[in-house]
UniProtKB/Swiss-Prot annotation:
It is an enzyme of class 7 (translocase). Residues 5-235 form the ABC transporter domain. The gene is potA. Part of the ABC transporter complex PotABCD involved in spermidine/putrescine import. Responsible for energy coupling to the transport system. This is Spermidine/putrescine import ATP-binding protein PotA. The keyword Translocase applies. It catalyses: ATP + H2O + polyamine-[polyamine-binding protein]Side 1 = ADP + phosphate + polyamineSide 2 + [polyamine-binding protein]Side 1. It comes from Bacillus thuringiensis subsp. konkukian (strain 97-27). Keywords: ATP-binding, Cell membrane, Membrane, Nucleotide-binding, Translocase, Transport. The complex is composed of two ATP-binding proteins (PotA), two transmembrane proteins (PotB and PotC) and a solute-binding protein (PotD).
């Protein structure tokens, strides 16, 4: 797949503070790439440099192999969607969507045609005459997205666009955004701190921490094979166990809990159940390993977990193939 954007040893300093040390990243044309990390990790700064709202202190940004460090945002064939929609309150949906084209002096007939298609793709046709105050948060976000895609950008940049919405609406819009990206076939670069959001929508995920890239991979690769201690603790739930000089990660769904009579492998350790949590269709057991004093998490079905009570002595263990060695 062709690389549309290249980030080559880019750094960003604010005064004497290094926000992003040398960082390199290739972004493929037509992919849904998510930059994921905690607050303050540098993900929004990276996005703003790609968009042209921040200038790299060092390094180069390339679009189609052309250097764009000094190219203004409006010449980059990119559009940015923020968490705060910045809609014009006195304009209806259609006029908000057409505003950028009007400023660019796009012919009125073409404005109408392109706005119609953008509203169709974002399911806004029936709301075209409403003003923002008469729209829900999700509908306002759709207007912001329609306003961005109506310009036919090569790349759509999204900075935590669903952060202000409630849980159900966020889930609905996650599916809509992924479907929209598939239909448009353009590159989406999406910034979020929400790992579930990243997992559900992305073709690839870039995990950032303190300005560095910790790991790049598909959602399955990031989840099943975390490379570093940070990724293992940030993505999903993991049991982190010391192994010689390093650490291994074991997902709770791979940890087995057996009665003393059912001990299967000699590697299983004696432990006792400290707590049991109901988590929907599963129960989460917290087992204190008597040998290592580690508190381990294990998932079981409600039927499997029904045999246990807090304080029960059990054996706990896992298959060696389920261990992931961490850097």
């Amino acid at each position: 797949m062709k690389k549309i954007i290249k980030v080559e040893a880019v750094e960003k300093h604010f005064g004497n503070q290094v926000i992003i040390p040398p960082l390199s990243l290739d972004i493929k044309e037509g992919e849904f790439l998510t930059i994921l990390g905690p607050s303050g990790c540098g993900k929004t700064t990276l996005l703003r440099m790609i968009a042209g709202f921040e200038t790299p202190t060092k390094g180069n940004l390339l679009l189609d192999d052309e250097k764009i460090n000094d190219l203004p945002p409006y010449k980059r064939h990119m559009n940015l969607v923020f968490q705060h929609y910045a809609l014009f309150p006195h304009m209806n949906v259609e006029k908000n969507i057409c505003f950028g084209m009007k400023m660019q002096k796009v012919p009125a007939a073409e404005q109408k045609e392109r706005a119609e298609e953008a509203m169709r793709l974002t399911q806004l046709l029936e709301f075209r005459n409403r003003k923002p105050a008469k729209l829900s948060g999700g509908q306002q976000q759709r207007v912001a997205i329609a306003r961005a895609i109506v310009n036919n950008p090569r790349v759509l940049l999204l900075d935590e666009p669903l952060g202000a919405l409630d849980f159900k609406l966020r889930k609905d819009l996650q599916r809509e955004l992924k479907n929209l990206q598939r239909n448009l076939g353009i590159t989406f670069i999406y910034v979020t701190h929400d790992q579930e959001e990243a997992m559900s929508m992305s073709d690839r995920i870039v995990v950032m921490n303190k300005g560095h890239i910790e790991q790049i991979g598909t959602p399955k690769e990031i989840y099943n094979k975390p490379k570093t201690l940070f990724v293992a603790t940030f993505i999903g739930e993991n049991n982190i166990v010391k192994n010689g000089e390093g650490y291994v990660a074991i997902r709770p769904e791979n940890v087995k809990v057996r009665s003393v009579e059912e001990r299967i492998l000699k590697e299983y350790h004696l432990g006792h159940i400290e707590d049991i949590e109901f988590v929907g269709n599963m129960e989460k057991l917290y087992v204190r390993d008597e040998k290592t004093s580690e508190l381990l998490m294990a998932y079981q079905t409600a039927e499997e977990a029904a045999q246990w009570s807090i304080g029960d002595n059990v054996y706990v263990g896992w298959e060696q193939e389920d261990e992931v060695t961490l850097n």
